[in-house]
Structure formats: structure tokens, C-alpha cells
């Protein structure tokens, strides 16, 4: 089983190890402020998936420097005692990172992208929070350094989408992908494995969909090219658009969420480790060989993790996944 890891992709593109730094822009979410809902997605913690991000009261530059220090403290020293260094992805992670006035976004994103050690600006957001002014800003920034947009699709199944309170239909995701790709912006799609009520085939259907292509026409959609060196053409036949990467996320049940309440009431069970490993293997087999696998599991804060408890041992999970991959093939 061959797959293209984020690590190998970044080394291929930038010639060195690239580390991700979680940045907190102090955003909220339309699923929390009452615009769509006030409860948030059913699985989302009070940190808006930014449990490991820095303090939002700090400047972007300060957050980057603090993150760098943490990374560098774990790096091996060279022969002269100096730390080996790499480059960084500035990842705006917590809540919805395009849900603010565009000038505020410009200020935050420009500060990040102009940092000399940042080689990629990555922005996690909702497909329904990508207005024309935001898209134009991202396009401008993409001319300076590569911009990635991470979209939380989670599932293609509307029943599941309603249960998790995603708050938008599949068509909105498709339009967002087209609008980003026609501007040459790379797209990474998040998928949750283990949602209540979904069979393994349901989950594989979502993964196959993400690995496929979105058909035109969508209004104002143009040719799918990318302005950044190192990114392959993503336009399929007959004007079809593809995303460049995927994050496979194990469903984590986090304390304080409505999902935790349902779990404790026995409304669903979480995947076991062996089930998850086999499912990830099938997911990778279902994806195009050139799609970048940005994540195969995920991190949940141990102190608030309700289930599955085996996922708290990330080293064990990654070893199980890597052993399976080594037995079945190689990593590209």
C-alpha cells in the first residue's frame, strides 16, 4: 500500500523537514455565535479544535516564536551542539479562521506569511465562510507564499451532517472547493471516521468522494491551475476539480460536548484500534496515489478525552498504522 505522506510531500517541495505551528487568531464560529446555531458541532470542544494552539491574546509573531521554541527543544543537536532547524507551517486552527472582517484577516494572515521561517499559511475554516472578499485576499496571499485552506467536511451523508450540526449542505462544500481551486489555492479536506450511525462503507464512500473530482459548472468557475511551484495540476477531465490533501480523523469523544452525553447514554460505540487501523488502510487504498495524507489519526487532549481511551496513546496508534502500511507496501 503506497501513500503520499505530508512529511514526504514537504521534503519534496521544500527540501527540508517542515513543522506545523498552531496559531490562535481569536476567532469564533457561526455555529456558536447564533448565526447558524449556538451549540457548535456536536463533537467540538470549547477550544474549537484548537486545544494545542497558543494564547489568542499574543501577537501572531509571538505565537510563532513560542511554537518554534517548543519544536526546537525537541530537535536533535548537530555535531557542533547547535540545534538543527527546519521551516514552518503557520496553521490558523481554532474555530472558523475566515469568520471576521477581511481587514482583520489581512492583518493576521499577512503577519504570519511574512515571517521568514514560515513557508506555508494554512487556514482551517468552514466552506460557508469564504465570501468573495475573503477569496480575493487568500488569492493575493497565495502569490506571496503557498496558502492552504482546510475544510471540515467530515461526511457526505446528510443524516450524519445533521446529527453533528455541521450547518451547511454538501453543495456549499463543492462550491468552496471550486472557488479555491480556480485561484490555485490548495485544499485539504477533513473527514471523521467513526461517526455514530455510519457503517464502514458509509465512511469509505465519503473518502472516495473526497478523492474524486467535483464537476462543473459552478458560477464563475475557471481553469483549475496552481500558481505555486511543486503543486501538480489538479484539474480532471471535463472541467472537474480535485482537492490536494485529506485529514483522516478518528472520532474523539470529548468531555463537555453533547457527543459525550450521547456516548454515556449508550447511543453509539467507538471504533476499536484494530478496526480503525483496517479502516484507515482501506481509506488509503481508495484514494489517488498523488493525494497527500495529512493525518491518519488525530490528537485529543488527554485530560478531556472520554473515548476511545486507546487513542490517547498516539505512539501506539501510529505504530499500529505504520506496521500495517509497511506490511502492505511503502510510503511515497
Question: How would you describe each model-predicted region?
Answer:
Residues 1-8, 12, 17-19, 217-218, ...:
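Auxiliary Fe-S-binding modules of radical SAM enzymes
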Residues 14-59:
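Canonical Radical SAM [4Fe-4S] cluster-binding loop centered on the CxxxCxxC motif
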Residues 19-23, 88-90, 121-123, 147-151, ...:
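Hydrophobic faces of well-ordered beta-strands that scaffold small-molecule active sites
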Residues 30-31, 51-53, 99-101, 255, ...:
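Short catalytic/ligand-binding loop motif for oxyanion handling, primarily in non-cytosolic enzymes
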Residues 48-90, 103, 107, 114, ...:
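Conserved alpha-helical substructure of the radical SAM core
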Residues 51-58, 94-107, 121-183, 193-214, ...:
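Conserved non-cysteine loop/helix-boundary elements of the Radical SAM core domain that shape
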Residues 73-85, 215-241:
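Intrinsically disordered, low-complexity terminal tails and inter-domain linkers enriched
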